[in-house]
């Protein structure tokens, strides 16, 4: 268990590290605006990518929908449940940082559900198109970086979200191939 002193030291260390990452961006409003646009834009891309994947499954073999929807939904629900139970604070709550991405609300930081969803969708695409899956994996990494640079997640939040999302998407794709 982490003591208050160790936790304070850890938070101070993260504040310093975050400011090293964010300082070059803070002085450039256009870059901060671009960070927010990329963050939001990639989320929209993943909504569309998931809809297209499900459309592809409907056309190619409707049985593929079961794992592509079911496994992803179970993973999403499990991550959401864990986030509520664990209720980890966000960086701007426990550290003295000013996030570059505006976000209302508190807690539920671990793991990152945006990152989970992006990696789950990207990995699921391997059943339909490897090149699209690879492009989406790159976009998922960019989203994870945006969430950390934006100050709304700690690196551990996005790493764990990426791992769980990748495993969920890989399982969904594997089961879809079997059908």
Language-model features: where?
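Hydrophobic alpha-helical membrane-embedded or membrane-associated segments
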Residues: 44, 48-51, 71-75, 161, ...
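Alpha-helical membrane-inserting segments
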Residues: 54, 74, 78, 82, ...
